[in-house]
């Protein structure tokens, strides 16, 4: 088989030798840097058809179609209606003109009466129609020579969304037609999938074609939103950005609540979330883009079948979310019918099965409501401090950040939360270096291995994932963390794997990749050929696409053939071209004399003679004349003359063909081995998915432990509830205490936050002035409770948090014009959901209840809500400015009155933002209005009106509590690093310890720890002064000091040539001491003969240069 590669695709053709008219065989090379990688001189490269069946499909495609009828079926008509609806949203003038030329009598929308519109059997349009009939709701792109073309409806979509111009302009007598060059395929696919369209790509079978016969074509792959086109990736050296997978989503309703099914075609898996509230369902829809949305008929409430099911009563929020999307209705059994729809959408066989990734759990908290998620910044919301940004350092993004977000939106079960918390605790205290935690998308990994398109880069990344897991298994401090991560990974993937089995399978997979993939850059066989007579650039371009991919032992025969053919080519060039060049050099002539050289024609992938004026005017039988007579014009792949200055000989052409054949055979063997490796790893795909997710979780939790340590957050005591009905609640299960709570968006280490202590054993009724901090307190409590039940650190000095079954926060409401609801209606809808779901294990936080309606009736509604929540036994806070609620005859028995404090400063009342006992009837409304710039005249008039009507109630009543004395945990001792054996840099480590020991009060306490080439420092270094020694790849040392060791290591490794640097470090007490030790090490190590890269830094200070030290020079180490 032969093959051809482009930047975006690799297409194949069978070895039809009898079609070659010449004995010369031609080939191409794979050059990622070239915009068009189609070989123009030599016939193409290596087949990537899966097997003989693929060729069979190509050659028999037309036979199947001849039996089909030209009459449209009902199903075809439904597809055309679907496309008509999409075309109605087009707005570009050029697209609208193309739409006018469509005729909806076939799936392509072609008008046969227009120019190039014929659908005659056997022509290109007819062939494209057959492919379109297999995937009628996908945009069809067909490879035609140097372009990918679309016609009819698909051309209109390309012009509208991909920014392409119609072929032939806007001629009214021609069918709509558009396309893109092959080097722009990836960009075109991205534009289409970004707008929600799926694309079917049809490739040509490349190679020579018999006269009067058309090229074979086949469907090479699909591009869907969240699932890119990967065909041909195995043969290129660049990585592919893989977006988050987008599932097909189905929504239904039953007596248990709403049900949401998400089916991931790439992973062949689905998740089923049942018993959801409307708010939780909308939250999931907001955070998960879907490829297709299907709505079950059970959502319709009335018999008329109208789709506006939320016009009255429940469902308005969901309707507002769904009405802005494209959706379809379906009936029947929800799961089986939805799976059937998915198989139709993706063209899957009925035998394909999907795995349920749900892990059953009896005590998992309910997912967050949309209002709760937005008001604490779990979902990015304008004007709301983002919770995710303070949980992780800025350097941690992507997959780990998405995991933390999903963890907050769907809090884990109690036992999983405990595992996560215990993991974070261990992570915050480890002293050994940690791996880099290579993060790979599971969907990307599965698709590339399944399609056998994983390239060298991806295999190296997979091996890094496996090696990171094995690194954790080898270290005593990290192996316990690895064991703890097994359950959270099980919940995230739905895969339950035994720990020992997992480790053994990781060993096997890592060894399998290591046996095949070339990881040693110094292997001599991986160097491209070099010959004196041929430009090095030629060999580099021809061989760099396969050299260094697999170990030489697997391709010894192919490498030998390449080297022999390269030597033969060099010999042919020397024999045919060198005498001519020698003759030219021996000629002494003024300006305008003969010129000649051996040159590399990059575009034609050939080595030819390039010269002019070298032919003698008189043939005298001198040296070089015979070679000149052998020269003939060089021809390109189409047989056309390249230029007047390019020449070759039959001997050189034969040598070139043989070299290209040997090089392409080597490349074919390399890709064959890579595909075989993909097949082997497919048998361990579950282990690879599990390992990739485990590392994502590891990186997320390690990063959180580092950031929480920097912010001086704490791990709360998490108290569970008894699951037995009628059992007494566990000790502390009905009480939440947060000591020294600070708003999560403030950095505690900066000292600007106001701390509050919240000891909650019942429902609080909270009052306070405007700007007094009520909303901030509710957000802070909500965030702390959510972080606690998720197993994460909280912004407090100490905390004891029950494992709530739900956390519900309601703050300000806005109107919803989509479903015709006022802001008060929206608020009441949310209050209904909260009241109906609140239990004795819930945390309910309502800010300024009933603010959007008439005061008297709003006060009564608020009082009734408070009674209902009190009856449920939940913990929580209801804040209000409706002071009339204190005059109502409420039956609530467990209400505690709380207020946000205020104090008088120079005759003005100002808030303290402190939580106190009692009731505060002062609103500070006038003061707030003044502060916000309301005209003085307006405020004065307001004060006069107030005094005239409410003078008798003007005095504020504030009941203040005794001062609460809280204790902070400032006496915690930082654990001293535990020494660990290191096998690398022993001599250097001993020298560092010996030098620094002279300055230490307790020399025996010195520990010099190491960080490997692909490792990072542990979280215990966060906030500590460190002295470090970097061992560069050039064997020189760089000595420095820093208070941010991880950041400094990343900065060093970001520089060219320093990616593989390893480090030794020790933690000291204070930056001044670190500076002294830095200077001391620079001078002392230099005297001991070590080569330093920053020797000049030893002269910056006047200390550390002498070996005689006074007592005052002695410092202590952490």
Curated annotation (Swiss-Prot):
Its main location: mitochondrion. One of its GO terms (biological process) is mismatch repair. Gene3D superfamilies: DNA repair protein MutS, domain I, GIY-YIG endonuclease, P-loop containing nucleotide triphosphate hydrolases. Changing residue 847 to N: In chm1-5; variegated plant phenotype. InterPro entries: DNA_mismatch_repair_MutS-lik_N (IPR007695), DNA_mismatch_repair_MutS_C (IPR000432), DNA_mismatch_repair_MutS_N (IPR016151), GIY-YIG_endonuc (IPR000305), GIY-YIG_endonuc_sf (IPR035901), MtDNA_mismatch_repair_MutS (IPR053276), P-loop_NTPase (IPR027417). GO terms for molecular function: ATP binding; DNA binding; mismatched DNA binding. It is found in: Mitochondrion; Plastid, Chloroplast. Pfam families: GIY-YIG, MutS_I, MutS_V. One of its GO terms (cellular component) is plastid. Disruption phenotype: Variegated plants and appearance of specific new restriction fragments in the mitochondrial genome. Keywords: ATP-binding, Chloroplast, DNA damage, DNA repair, DNA-binding, Mitochondrion, Nucleotide-binding, Plastid, Transit peptide. ATP binds at residues 768-775. Belongs to the DNA mismatch repair MutS family. DNA mismatch repair protein specifically involved in maintenance of mitochondrial genome configuration by controlling specific rearranged portion. Functions by suppressing asymmetric recombination at some repeat pairs. This is DNA mismatch repair protein MSH1, mitochondrial. It comes from Arabidopsis thaliana (Mouse-ear cress). The lineage of its organism: Eukaryota, Viridiplantae, Streptophyta, Embryophyta, Tracheophyta.
């Amino acid at each position: 088989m032969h093959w051809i590669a482009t930047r975006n695709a690799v297409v194949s053709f069978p070895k039809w030798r009898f079609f070659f008219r010449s004995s010369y065989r031609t080939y191409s090379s794979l050059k990622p840097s070239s915009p068009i990688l189609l070989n123009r001189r030599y016939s193409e490269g290596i087949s990537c058809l899966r097997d003989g069946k693929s060729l069979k499909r190509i050659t028999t495609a037309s036979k199947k179609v001849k039996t089909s009828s030209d009459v449209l079926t009902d199903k075809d008509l439904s597809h055309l209606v679907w496309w008509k609806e999409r075309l109605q949203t087009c707005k570009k003038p050029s697209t609208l003109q193309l739409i006018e030329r469509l005729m909806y009598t076939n799936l392509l929308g072609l008008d046969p009466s227009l120019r190039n519109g014929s659908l005659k059997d056997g022509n290109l349009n007819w062939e494209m129609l057959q492919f379109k009939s297999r995937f009628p709701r996908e945009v069809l792109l067909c490879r035609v020579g140097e372009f990918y073309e679309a016609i009819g409806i698909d051309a209109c979509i390309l012009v509208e969304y991909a920014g392409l111009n119609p072929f032939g302009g806007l001629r009214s007598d021609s069918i709509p037609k558009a396309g893109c060059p092959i080097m722009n395929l990836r960009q075109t696919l991205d534009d289409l999938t970004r707008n929600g369209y799926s694309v079917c790509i049809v490739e040509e079978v490349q190679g020579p074609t018999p006269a009067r016969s058309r090229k074979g074509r086949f469907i090479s792959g699909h591009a869907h939103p969240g699932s890119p086109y990967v065909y041909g990736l195995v043969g290129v050296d660049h990585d592919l950005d893989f977006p988050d997978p987008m599932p097909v989503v189905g929504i239904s309703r039953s007596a248990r609540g709403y049900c949401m099914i998400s089916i991931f075609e790439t992973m062949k898996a689905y998740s089923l979330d049942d018993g959801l509230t409307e708010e939780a369902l909308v939250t999931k829809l907001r955070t998960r883009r879907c490829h297709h949305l299907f709505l079950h008929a059970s959502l319709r409430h009335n018999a008329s079948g109208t789709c506006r099911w939320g016009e009255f009563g429940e469902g308005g929020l969901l309707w507002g979310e769904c009405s802005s999307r494209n959706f379809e209705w379906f009936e029947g059994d929800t799961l089986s019918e939805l799976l059937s729809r998915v198989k139709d959408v993706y063209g899957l066989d009925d035998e394909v099965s999907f795995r349920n990734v749900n892990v059953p759990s009896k005590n998992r908290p309910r997912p967050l409501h949309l209002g709760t998620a937005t008001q604490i910044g779990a979902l990015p919301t304008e004007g709301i401090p983002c919770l995710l940004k303070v949980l992780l350092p800025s350097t941690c993004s992507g997959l780990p950040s998405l995991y933390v977000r999903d963890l907050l939106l769907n809090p884990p079960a109690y036992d999983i939360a405990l595992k996560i918390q215990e993991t974070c605790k261990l992570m915050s205290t480890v002293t050994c270096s940690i791996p880099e935690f290579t993060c790979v998308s599971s969907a990307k990994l599965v698709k590339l291995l399944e399609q056998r398109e994983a390239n060298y880069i991806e295999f190296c990344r997979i091996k890094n994932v496996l090696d990171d897991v094995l690194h954790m298994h080898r270290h005593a401090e990290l192996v316990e963390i690895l064991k703890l991560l097994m359950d959270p990974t099980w919940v995230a993937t739905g895969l339950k794997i035994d720990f020992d089995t997992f480790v053994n399978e990781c060993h096997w997979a890592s060894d399998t990749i290591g046996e095949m993939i070339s990881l040693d850059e110094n292997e001599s066989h991986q160097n491209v050929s070099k010959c004196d007579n041929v430009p090095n650039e030629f060999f580099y371009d021809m061989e760099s696409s396969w050299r260094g991919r697999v170990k030489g032992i697997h391709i010894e025969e192919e490498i030998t053939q390449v080297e022999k053919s390269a030597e033969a080519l060099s010999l042919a060039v020397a024999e045919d071209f060198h005498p001519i060049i020698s003759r030219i050099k021996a000629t002494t002539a003024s300006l305008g004399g003969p010129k000649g050289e051996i040159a590399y024609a990059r575009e034609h992938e050939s080595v030819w003679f390039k010269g002019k004026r070298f032919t003698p005017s008189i043939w005298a039988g001198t040296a070089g004349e015979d070679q000149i007579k052998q020269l003939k014009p060089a021809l390109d792949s189409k047989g056309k003359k390249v230029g007047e200055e390019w020449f070759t000989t039959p001997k050189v052409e034969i040598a070139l063909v043989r070299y290209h054949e040997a090089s392409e055979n080597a490349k074919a063997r390399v890709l064959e081995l890579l595909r075989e490796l993909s097949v082997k790893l497919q048998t361990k795909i579950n282990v690879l998915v599990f390992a990739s997710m485990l590392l994502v979780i590891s990186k997320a939790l390690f990063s959180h432990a580092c950031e929480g340590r920097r912010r001086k957050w704490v791990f709360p005591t998490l108290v569970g509830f008894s699951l037995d009905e009628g059992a007494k609640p566990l000790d502390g299960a009905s009480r939440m205490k947060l000591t020294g709570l600070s708003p999560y968006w403030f950095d505690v280490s900066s000292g600007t936050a106001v701390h509050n202590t919240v000891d909650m054993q019942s429902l609080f009724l909270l009052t306070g002035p405007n700007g007094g901090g009520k909303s901030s307190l509710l957000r802070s409590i909500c965030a702390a409770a959510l972080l606690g039940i998720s197993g994460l650190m909280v912004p407090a000095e100490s905390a004891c948090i029950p494992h709530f079954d739900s956390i519900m926060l309601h703050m300000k409401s806005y109107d919803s014009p989509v479903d015709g609801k006022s802001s008060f209606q929206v608020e009441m809808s949310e209050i209904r959901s909260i009241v109906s779901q609140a239990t004795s294990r819930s945390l309910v936080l309502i800010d300024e209840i009933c603010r959007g309606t008439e005061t008297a009736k709003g006060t009564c509604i608020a009082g009734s809500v408070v009674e209902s929540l009190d009856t449920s036994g939940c913990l929580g806070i209801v804040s209000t400015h409706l002071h009339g609620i204190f005059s109502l005859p409420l039956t609530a028995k467990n209400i505690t009155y709380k207020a946000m404090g205020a104090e008088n400063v120079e005759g003005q009342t100002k808030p303290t933002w402190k939580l106190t006992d009692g009731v505060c009837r002062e609103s500070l409304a006038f003061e707030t209005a003044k502060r916000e710039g309301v005209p003085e005249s307006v405020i004065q008039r307001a004060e006069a009106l107030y005094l005239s009507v409410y003078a008798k109630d003007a005095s504020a009543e504030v009941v203040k509590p005794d001062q609460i004395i809280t204790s902070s945990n400032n006496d915690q001792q930082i654990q001293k690093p535990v020494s660990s054996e290191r096998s690398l840099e022993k001599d250097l480590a001993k020298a560092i310890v010996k030098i620094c020991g002279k300055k230490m009060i307790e020399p025996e306490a010195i520990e010099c720890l190491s960080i490997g080439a692909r490792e990072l420092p542990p979280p215990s270094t966060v906030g500590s002064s460190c002295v470090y020694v970097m061992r560069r790849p050039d064997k020189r040392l760089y000595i420095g000091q820093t208070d941010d060791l991880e950041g400094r290591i990343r900065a060093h490794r970001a520089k060219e040539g320093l990616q593989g640097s390893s480090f030794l470090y020790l933690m000291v007490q204070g930056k001044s001491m670190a500076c002294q030790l830095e200077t001391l090490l620079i001078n002392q190590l230099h005297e001991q003969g070590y080569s330093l890269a920053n020797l000049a830094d030893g002269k910056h200070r006047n200390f550390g240069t002498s070996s005689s030290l006074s007592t005052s020079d002695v410092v202590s180490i952490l």
